[in-house]
């Protein structure tokens, strides 16, 4: 089965642009929905963003992949998001990435469409391999010119379903269906040493019947729809902001800087991050949990709080200390430049550094306070720290008497006792093992984010004039979506140990966060209010440009690239 008229079907549908404005509700939902059939090369599938699909896609006719499915692909790929004055800020943010200006980096036009060839002697197909630069350029081309020209440029006139597969790969995605991948791998050979275009004359250009079943073709078309929608929801890098000097100049002129921080800002203090090879989740694999994240699962906590309190001492933050990076943010506040610091950390070190509560949003809560899960009595978090260090369940004094009745043999505060003592026959079935247990006010999986996050972000994304993401891999939604909420003309800077490949930062400074903060302060002529500043201000830093807008920062203390 060949697909000679697919481009015509897609192009014809693309001519009928969506003229009505996308409603705030539709657009906000679109931002938060996530594709389930494809995963990004650099990001888990549950973190993806996609535009909502029209009903026609949900009931695709699998017996006619050349008819309704082609039209549906064109319909979704050609959707345009147009902001209006009364749109929700979250809706405007997604719509704004579609608009283009002179500040946007213009992509290169490829030399020709994707080439797939077939060896007539053995029937094996030869597919292309793509470089990181080619993938980035393709995504930029789609954003800059739209789906119509993108498909017309990257696909040949006559094509089969394998072209759809390779177009998905070119955009930086991988098909998740293992059965489909197995079929493709059995008929395709990727020559890693030479490009398909350079292979000998024994390889003929593909114009034979489709090697995949109709159902598999439909699956690929759906995946391409999702890939296109994901790309259309992300921003393009700015053409006039890609050097350290650009960053320094912007820091001097910016007045409303939005700072998003993650675990990397605290690792210099000995606090582990969560997802690295040496992070917290790696250290607790020995507990035998199906998923290490279960220690922060709210439902599990309510049924057995000892799961969390067995390891809580490992994430308990040190008191009254903070890093030079925390003080760098405090410096921005002192200069009247800090709009807000959104932190994913639960250690509350920002407050120790002096960042005011009105400038701080603890997206995932913190150890600053604790609350009884039964009567909701609230107290300062430091009052349960000793219990946590001693592997004891912190219990509410107001619920203690009742807990003793429900758990006559296991009412005490030893970790694990409540989960193993006191049978269900001795208490009502609705009384959980967490009765009367104090829980730190950190946001567990299954809990809603604090109201302050939702209230603040709606205003801040429209007011900020610079976004700086520090020490975060941006893998936890909805905080990770902030980079796509901010208007496209606002410069975005990453300061992190490792690159974040699923976001389009204008400038990435890779290295130790404290070092980079000190280097930036030196170049700005500023003083970081931290006890280590006397050493940091005289430190020598080297910046090595790895790619356009990507620099590796090293020092005498940390000479190795990361």
Swiss-Prot record:
Q: List locations, semicolon-separated.
A: Nucleus, Nucleolus
Keyword annotations of the record: Chromatin regulator, DNA damage, DNA repair, Metal-binding, NAD, Nucleus, Repressor, Transcription, Transcription regulation, Transferase, Zinc
Q: MF terms per GO, please?
A: DNA replication origin binding; histone deacetylase activity, NAD-dependent; histone H3K14 deacetylase activity, NAD-dependent; histone H3K9 deacetylase activity, NAD-dependent; histone H4K16 deacetylase activity, NAD-dependent; metal ion binding; NAD+ binding
Q: Which residues form the signal peptide?
A: none
- Give me the ranges of the annotated region Disordered: 1-67
Further information:
Its stability is directly linked to life span, which is extended when it is present in high dosage. Conversely, its absence shortens life span.
- What protein name is recorded for this chain? NAD-dependent histone deacetylase SIR2
> Which organism was this protein described from?
Saccharomyces cerevisiae (strain ATCC 204508 / S288c)
């Amino acid at each position: 089965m060949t697909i000679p008229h697919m481009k015509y079907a897609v192009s014809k549908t693309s001519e009928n642009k969506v003229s009505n404005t996308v409603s705030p509700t539709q657009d906000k939902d679109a931002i938060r929905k996530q594709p389930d059939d494809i995963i990004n090369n650099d990001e888990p599938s549950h973190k993806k963003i996609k535009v909502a699909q029209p009903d026609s896609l949900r009931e695709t006719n699998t017996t006619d992949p050349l008819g309704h499915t082609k039209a549906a692909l064109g319909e979704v790929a050609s959707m345009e998001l147009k902001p209006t004055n009364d749109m929700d800020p979250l809706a405007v943010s997604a719509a704004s990435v579609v608009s283009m200006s002179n500040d946007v980096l213009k992509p290169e036009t490829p030399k020709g469409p994707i080439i797939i060839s077939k060896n007539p002697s053995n029937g094996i197909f030869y597919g292309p391999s793509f470089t990181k630069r080619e993938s980035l350029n393709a995504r930029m081309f789609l954003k800059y010119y739209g789906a119509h020209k993108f498909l017309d440029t990257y696909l040949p006139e006559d094509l089969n379903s394998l072209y759809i597969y390779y177009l998905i790969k070119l955009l930086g995605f991988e098909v998740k269906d293992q059965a489909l991948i197995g079929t493709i791998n059995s008929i395709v050979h990727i020559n890693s040493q030479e490009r398909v275009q350079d292979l000998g004359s024994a390889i003929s250009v593909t114009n034979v019947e489709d090697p995949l079943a109709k159902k598999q073709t439909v699956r690929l078309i759906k995946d391409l729809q999702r890939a296109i929608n994901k790309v259309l929801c992300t921003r393009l890098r700015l053409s006039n902001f890609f050097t350290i000097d650009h960053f320094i100049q912007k820091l001097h002129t910016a007045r409303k800087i939005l700072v998003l921080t993650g675990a990397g800002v605290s690792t210099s203090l000995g606090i582990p991050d969560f997802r690295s090879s040496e992070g917290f989740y790696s250290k607790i694999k020995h507990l035998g949990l199906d998923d290490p994240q279960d220690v922060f699962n709210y439902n599990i906590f309510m049924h057995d709080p000892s799961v969390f309190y067995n390891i809580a001492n490992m994430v308990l933050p040190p008191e009254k200390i903070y890093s030079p990076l925390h003080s760098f943010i405090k410096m921005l506040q002192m200069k009247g430049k800090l709009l807000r610091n959104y932190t994913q950390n639960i250690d509350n070190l920002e407050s120790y550094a002096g960042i005011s509560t009105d400038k701080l949003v603890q997206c995932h809560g913190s150890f600053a306070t604790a609350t009884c899960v039964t009567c909701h009595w609230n107290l300062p978090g430091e009052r349960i720290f000793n219990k946590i260090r001693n592997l004891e369940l912190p219990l509410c004094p107001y619920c203690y008497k009742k807990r003793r009745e429900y758990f006559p043999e296991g009412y005490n505060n030893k970790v694990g006792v409540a989960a193993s003592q006191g049978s269900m026959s001795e208490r009502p079935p609705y009384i959980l093992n967490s009765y009367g247990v104090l829980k730190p006010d950190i946001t567990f999986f299954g809990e809603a984010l604090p109201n302050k996050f939702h209230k603040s972000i709606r205003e801040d994304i429209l007011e900020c004039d610079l976004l700086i993401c520090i020490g975060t891999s941006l893998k936890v939604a909805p905080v990770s979506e902030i980079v796509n909420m901010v208007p496209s003309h606002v410069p975005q800077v990453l300061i992190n140990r490792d690159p974040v490949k699923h976001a389009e930062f204008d400038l990435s400074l890779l290295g130790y966060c404290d070092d980079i903060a000190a280097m930036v302060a030196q170049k700005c002529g500023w003083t970081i209010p931290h006890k280590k500043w006397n050493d940091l201000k005289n430190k020598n830093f080297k910046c090595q440009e790895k790619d356009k807008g990507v620099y590796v920062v090293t020092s005498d203390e940390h000479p190795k690239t990361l």
